């Protein structure tokens, strides 16, 4: 993709990685693997990949701004927990669209925290993303408030999807701030470092030993997570948080195509 800016290339690769991750999250959940176990497996694979790469490159593991890196890990864990619940309880494209309210949240938070300007184009994208999310969730809202028989989905899952998007927006702003001084792999490393121990208590009593197919799906969740996280962090280094995350809207397209092909 030589005709695209480097930041756009990174963010599109990130969008593809996250879309494939969401697909295998959905497939793993369909096998009866608990959401938090999927999250822990993702964190374990990402932790190993990040650790090996950092050690091989001679890069210090813990970075310099440890407090902000830890906060990024915690907020990312919260965003992912909410997002995974939405992905496993809603159609893939619908969950993805809700998650992609996060560029709107990123733009607003970036304005207040990073002092990034919100131009007319960015503002238009915010309005359109909110309208899109409302259009998608309207049938469920209508169905919950009337006797009209429409296809409805869990309002809790919808609320969690929106909450996950808000937390993702906050995490992206933190990543942008960290990317000025920290190595991308160090930023990525802190997420599984926090998420793995944090997720274990939530699935310990209902742990499921996956079969071979489930094991492969879980490994792929972690691998595609790493692709998405690393390229997203690199893209954030080169572009403002609001503009960089706008490219991630392509994940909606990727998720829809993958959903049609693999999930009918």
Question: How does the language model describe each region?
Answer:
Residues 20, 58-96, 135, 223-239:
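Specific transmembrane alpha-helical segments of multi-pass solute transporters/efflux pumps
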Residues 31-78, 167-171, 190-205:
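Transmembrane alpha-helices of multi-pass small-molecule transport proteins
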Residues 1-10, 107-166, 180:
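Juxtamembrane helix-loop boundary signature in multi-pass membrane transporters
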Residues 6-13, 64-75, 118-131, 157, ...:
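Cytoplasmic-side transmembrane-helix entry/capping segments in multi-pass membrane proteins
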Residues 54, 58, 85, 103-127, ...:
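C-terminal transmembrane-helix exit sites in multi-pass transporters
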Residues 95-101, 178-194, 229-260:
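Helix-helix packing/entry segments at the starts of transmembrane helices
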Residues 15-23, 51, 73, 77-81, ...:
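Hydrophobic/small/kink-forming positions within alpha-helical transmembrane segments
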Residues 143-207:
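Transmembrane alpha-helical segments that form core, pore/gating elements
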């Amino acid at each position: 993709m030589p005709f695209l800016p480097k930041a756009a290339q990174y963010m599109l690769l990130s969008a593809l990685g996250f879309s494939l991750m969401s697909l295998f999250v959905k497939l793993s959940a369909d096998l009866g693997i608990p959401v938090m176990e999927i999250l822990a497996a993702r964190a374990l694979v990402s932790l190993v990949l990040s650790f090996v790469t950092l050690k091989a490159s001679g890069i210090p593991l813990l970075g310099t701004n440890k407090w902000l890196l830890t906060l990024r890990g915690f907020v990312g864990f919260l965003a992912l927990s909410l997002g995974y619940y939405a992905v496993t309880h809603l159609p893939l494209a619908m969950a993805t669209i809700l998650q992609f309210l996060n560029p709107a949240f990123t733009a607003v938070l970036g304005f207040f925290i990073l002092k990034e300007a919100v131009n007319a184009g960015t503002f238009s994208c915010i309005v359109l993303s909110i309208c899109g999310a409302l259009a998608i969730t309207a049938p469920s809202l209508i169905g919950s408030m009337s006797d009209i028989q429409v296809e409805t989905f869990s309002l809790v899952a919808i609320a969690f999807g929106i909450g996950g998007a808000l937390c993702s927006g906050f995490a992206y702003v933190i990543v942008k701030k960290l990317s000025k001084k920290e190595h991308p792999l160090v930023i990525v490393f802190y997420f599984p470092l926090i998420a793995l121990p944090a997720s274990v208590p939530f699935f310990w009593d209902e742990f499921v030993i996956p079969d071979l197919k489930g094991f492969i799906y879980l490994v792929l969740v972690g691998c595609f997570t790493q692709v998405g996280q690393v390229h997203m962090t690199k893209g954030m280094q080169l572009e403002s948080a609001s503009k960089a995350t706008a490219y991630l809207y392509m994940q909606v397209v990727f998720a829809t195509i993958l959903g049609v092909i693999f999930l009918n």
